[in-house]
Each structure stands twice: as structure tokens, then as C-alpha cells.
A protein has these predicted regions:
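Active-site helix of classical SDR
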Residues: 1
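NAD(P)-dependent short-chain dehydrogenase/reductase
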Residues: 7-54, 60-61, 67
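Residues that recognize and position ribonucleotide moieties
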Residues: 17, 46, 55, 87, ...
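Substrate-binding strand-loop-helix patch
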Residues: 27-28, 52-63, 83-101, 150
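A general structural signal marking secondary-structure boundaries and capping sites
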Residues: 40-44, 70-74, 102, 137, ...
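Amphipathic alpha-helical segments that line or abut small-molecule/effector binding pockets
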Residues: 60-71, 145, 149
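Mid/C-terminal beta-alpha module of Rossmann-like enzyme folds, strongest
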Residues: 72-119, 159
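Conserved C-terminal active-site "lid" loop/helix of NAD(P)H-dependent oxidoreductases
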Residues: 90-92, 96, 112-151, 155, ...
Length: 159
């Protein structure tokens, strides 16, 4: 598990920086943003869960904070830190804005998690507290909708 990996690293006693993140997306690979762009372009209606809340993380912003830590020579600040973009949304909110920014007209409807049975138990609230990271490294974290706009613009340019 991720926790076991973190504990193993901590047990070595070496200097380390572990960054926990959530709801990660980018222009590359498979992720929620690209899936929603495709589904909202090909469906008239779509159900998305509204009872799971968190904060999306743009991979470009995660890379920027890692670069900031390295470039400002702060690698001695050992510990576990949380990083995601600023703000909070549900998967439903996230999907609606992805659809809108992508120029799609799909009718996205809210639903409960129980409507999509999964062997993996997902938390209903998974917002990460970034205060330690921001205070320790002096990094200004972008708001999730601003980063989403940037990602969708880059996806549009790549077409």
C-alpha cells in the first residue's frame, strides 16, 4: 500500500520528502478529464457522483511544486506533505465544468456513489490539507478551475 511505502521510507531514517496527492489529471494518459471530455462529446446525458468531494490536482502544478522545492534547495525539509489545487468540488461539479470548458452540451446529472458499485471503497470527503506544504516551501497553489482551463486549452491545441 501507499502507507506501507511511506512507513518504509520513514523507517530508513534518510532525508525524504513525500508528497501525497489526489484526483490527478493532465493532458497525457488516462484520467478523469480526458474521459469526461470523450463521454460528454459522445453522450446526450451522463450520471456522475456528487457525494464524493475532493480537489483535483493538475499534474503540471504538482511538477511545478516539486521543481520549486528542488530549485530553491529545500530538500532538507524532511516529511510528508499534501498537494492538490486550491478549492473543493464533487466529481459531478468537476465533470460539469470539464463539459462546459470543452464546448460539449451533455446533460450531466448528479447521482449517489451507490449507483456505481465498486470493489474499492472511496471516501466521501478527500480534501487534502496543504497548509504544511504552503508554509514550509512558500508555494502559491493555483485554484483548480484555473488549472483545469489551462489543461483543457493545451488539450485543444494538441488536436
Amino acid at each position: 500500500t501507499k502507507l506501507a511505502g511511506e512507513k518504509s521510507i520513514e523507517a530508513t531514517g534518510c532525508k525524504h520528502i513525500i508528497i501525497r496527492t489526489a484526483w490527478l489529471y493532465s493532458q497525457w494518459g488516462k484520467n478523469f478529464v480526458k474521459t469526461m471530455q470523450s463521454l460528454t462529446a459522445s453522450h446526450d446525458t451522463l450520471k456522475v457522483v456528487f457525494d464524493q468531494v475532493g480537489t483535483p490536482t493538475y499534474a503540471g502544478d504538482l511538477a511545478a511544486v516539486i521543481s520549486h522545492i528542488i530549485e530553491t534547495n529545500q530538500l532538507d525539509k524532511t516529511g510528508i506533505y499534501h498537494f492538490s489545487n486550491e478549492g473543493v468540488c464533487s466529481w459531478f461539479d468537476f465533470a460539469k465544468i470539464i463539459c462546459e470548458l470543452s464546448g460539449n452540451t451533455c446533460d450531466i446529472q448528479p447521482c449517489y456513489s451507490e449507483e456505481f458499485p465498486s470493489p474499492v471503497k472511496r471516501p466521501h470527503f478527500s480534501v487534502l490539507d496543504k497548509s504544511k506544504l504552503k508554509q514550509t516551501f512558500g508555494f502559491k497553489v493555483p485554484y483548480w478551475t484555473d488549472s483545469l482551463k489551462k489543461c483543457i486549452a493545451e488539450l485543444a491545441e494538441a488536436k
